[in-house]
Regions:
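ATP-dependent adenylation/nucleotidyltransferase module used to activate substrates
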Residues: 1-169, 180, 196, 269
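AMP-forming adenylation/ATP pyrophosphatase catalytic core
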Residues: 6, 126-132, 137-140, 149-376
Length: 376
């Protein structure tokens, strides 16, 4: 974070009530900057359904903003969230896919709806994401003349466990241009130490887990509310024998091990027949069903317009590991299908599921090119 480049910038800080965004505010204020502070409200549809963690989030954000002499403004993006992110999630789950609502929340809400409501008044939007950026000097032709240009890249955090580039891999180039990650170069332990040293009210607060708006709401209860239940059979893949029953295929994802309620396990979900409403499970001893090494990704979204190279690393879920792979453009009648690739991973990957985002990085797992949806 170059303070010289930020001196004359109007900066909006998105406070969530957590320790990360609170340290973001501290980092900016200690360098003499006066950012605007905002809390985005995206809670459940009815106010009475807000749990204590949602109320606590706002209380924490208010306390931290006041500590540094900033006024906190609450921005209601509840309707946009439920109209866009929830619809995306329910449509995907109903179709038997495995979506990631937090990925779309960043694109559609934090850097989308918020920008439309208040973010457009600011040059930069600062968040507590563990990610970094870098600017590459480029050469480009403008009106027949060679001109200097700049290309901004989304890059990984030095903390592999906390790195959140996978959650940011669907944002647009203009959103990346406005993004500022003041703690992205830090390790989580360092952020905690700063919070404790500065006596922040949430210094010892646990990190949030799961989908950003649910708080303590159970994800299956959330699905049940919008999709209901649809009982069906659980079948052992190898034998075709019915060994149990489920309450709806949308409650289960490929690779899932827990929550099946079956004896004699462990059992893994390896396949879903959406039309017949059948969940297929296996003990995981068949690598051809439990693991995949080659799979297609469609509608690849490039963050800054740069196409990924052949040799890459990737993630299909939020883990510290990056898997080496190669990308092969998918062709149809000798013509490439726009933004579609066949992934050839260097090793079999467990739990590859349709609807997941495959996040693509360079072979040093430093620069993030973007992500595409797996369509196994």
């Amino acid at each position: 974070m170059n303070i010289k480049e930020l001196e004359n910038k109007r900066i909006a800080v998105l406070l969530s009530g957590g320790v990360d965004s609170s340290v973001v505010l501290y980092e900016l204020v200690r360098q003499g900057l006066q950012p605007g502070c905002f809390y985005i409200k995206i809670g459940p549809e009815e106010e009475e359904e807000w749990d204590c963690s949602s109320e606590e989030d706002l209380e924490m954000a208010t306390a931290v903003s006041h500590k540094y002499g900033c006024k906190l403004e609450v921005i209601d993006c509840h309707r946009e969230y439920w109209d866009q992110v929830t619809k995306y999630t329910m449509d995907k789950v109903r179709a038997g896919l495995t979506p990631n609502p937090d990925v779309m929340c960043n694109r559609l809400i934090k850097f989308g709806a918020f920008h439309e409501k208040r973010g457009h008044d600011y040059d930069l939007i600062a968040t507590g994401h563990y990610a970094t950026t870098e600017v590459e000097e480029t050469k480009e032709m403008v009106n027949g003349k060679l001109s200097n240009g700049k290309l901004k890249w989304l890059c990984t955090s030095p903390d592999p466990v906390k790195d959140q580039t996978d959650f940011l891999a669907q944002i647009y180039d203009w959103q990346l241009e406005k993004a500022l990650f003041p703690i992205g170069h830090m390790m989580k332990e360092e952020v905690r130490e700063i919070a404790e040293r500065e006596h922040l009210v949430n210094a010892k607060r646990k990190d949030s887990q799961g989908i950003c708006f649910l708080g303590k709401i159970n994800y299956n209860d959330y699905l049940r509310r919008y999709l209901g239940e649809l009982p069906g059979d659980v079948v052992e893949l190898e034998t075709g024998k019915i060994i149990g029953h489920h309450k709806g295929h949308w409650f289960h994802t490929i690779g899932q091990r827990k929550g099946m309620g079956l004896g004699g396990g462990p059992w893994f979900v390896v396949k879903k027949d959406i039309l017949q409403n059948i969940i297929y499970v296996s003990h995981g001893y068949d690598p051809e069903t439990a693991y995949k090494q080659d799979f297609p990704i469609m509608a690849f979204h490039s963050i800054n317009g740069q196409l990924p190279p052949t040799d890459i690393t990737l993630k299909i879920r939020h883990t510290p590991e990056f898997i080496p792979a190669t990308l092969e453009p998918i062709a149809n009648s000798k013509e490439p299908i726009a933004n579609s690739y066949m992934v050839h991973a260097a090793q079999p990957i467990h739990g590859v599921a349709p609807g997941q985002f495959c996040v693509v990085y360079d072979n040093r797992h430093h620069r993030c090119y973007g992500s595409g949806e797996i369509t196994v």
